[in-house]
Amino acid sequence: MGKISSLPTQLFKCCFCDFLKVKMHIMSSSHLFYLALCLLTFTSSATAGPETLCGAELVDALQFVCGDRGFYFNKPTGYGSSSRRAPQTGIVDECCFRSCDLRRLEMYCAPLKPAKSARSVRAQRHTDMPKAQKEVHLKNASRGSAGNKNYRM
């Protein structure tokens, strides 16, 4: 014998179908296309299993996420909690043997390098001075009060 549905379920299905029929007449074909595209996207992503990254794919993903900073295959010492993970766990263990997300990849990026500050004039060597100042500096250095005496250093 067939399965008998409850009355509220049948009423809901009937009302929902009528609602969809009215909406379908109002919807243009482009709206219908985008709706179908969204449904396909959601169903394909829902049925896809967790993906893993190994080899060149893992390296490409790390280069994309980390950019110019670079990355580590093992976490640097003292990075993250060592109590919940084995000490030798690396990115391959986490993303190749199991699936991992973007945050997990970011954990293996090298830290940002601080921007180099401009050198002050005082910190520059005398060889970095403009030529006119260098000549004055050399002339003044040769005019010492020592006269013709030679000092040994």
From Swiss-Prot:
Its main location: secreted. Keywords: Disulfide bond, Growth factor, Secreted, Signal. Residues 49-77 are annotated as: B. It is found in: Secreted. The gene is IGF1. GO terms for cellular component: alphav-beta3 integrin-IGF-1-IGF1R complex; exocytic vesicle; extracellular space. Residues 78-89 are annotated as: C. CDD domains: IlGF (cd04368). SMART domains: IlGF. This is Insulin-like growth factor 1. Belongs to the insulin family. The insulin-like growth factors, isolated from plasma, are structurally and functionally related to insulin but have a much higher growth-promoting activity. May be a physiological regulator of [1-14C]-2-deoxy-D-glucose (2DG) transport and glycogen synthesis in osteoblasts. Stimulates glucose transport in bone-derived osteoblastic (PyMS) cells and is effective at much lower concentrations than insulin, not only regarding glycogen and DNA synthesis but also with regard to enhancing glucose uptake. May play a role in synapse maturation. Residues 90-110 are annotated as: A. Residues 142-153 have a biased composition (Polar residues). PROSITE patterns: INSULIN. GO terms for molecular function: growth factor activity; hormone activity; insulin-like growth factor receptor binding. Pfam families: Insulin. Residues 125-138 have a biased composition (Basic and acidic residues). Residues 119-153 form a propeptide.
